[in-house]
Amino acid sequence: MTDTVPDPEPEPAWRRATAGESRWAASIALLIAIACQMVLPVEFTTHRWLVPAIELGMLVWSLLMNPNRIDRHSGALRRVNLALIGVLTLANARAAWGLVDHIVGGQATNAGRLLVSGAAIWVTNMIAFALWYWEFDRGGPGRRSEGIREYPDFLFPQMQNPDLAPKDWEPSFVDYLYLSFTNATAFSPTDVLPMTQWAKLTMLAQ
């Protein structure tokens, strides 16, 4: 009587090719960030309407290239997305500098306006870094859908204990948004651990 060899455990969804991720959560977050930029006072921005208009144009361009599900890697689409996130991040850094300059220089006299501006800059920063994490983890959403890269840049709890998640679980934009939120509030990793140098440096920059 021969021993039967048990079938090997199937690869978890985050390590194999999948149908990809809908991009609408990331797109909605981008629209919220752009709206936050538009409520900032003009003295905190270089061009109050120009930068949001450029960002909206790049977002529309990106959606025209792929309007729904990111199920494969596209170099052209990724370049547009990275450029958009870069513009968003630089514009928000400029606004943060303007806010600090007004506070230190004693030019800020309206407390309510300061609170609204600070909240808008903080939310935009959180969304911008969530997008960086989403675009860079294992090569971006397109590469993740192809299941090419074996090792994650961010270690989520579901990866360490697959019994805590459905078999088809894989990280989506909301997971990266929560990662960015906890990093911005706790100033340290919480449930998600950075595994690579770029991930650690990006969290440090945030």
Regions picked out by a protein language model, each given a short descriptive name:
Residues 14-28:
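N-terminal membrane topogenic signal
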Residues 58-72:
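Canonical alpha-helical transmembrane segments
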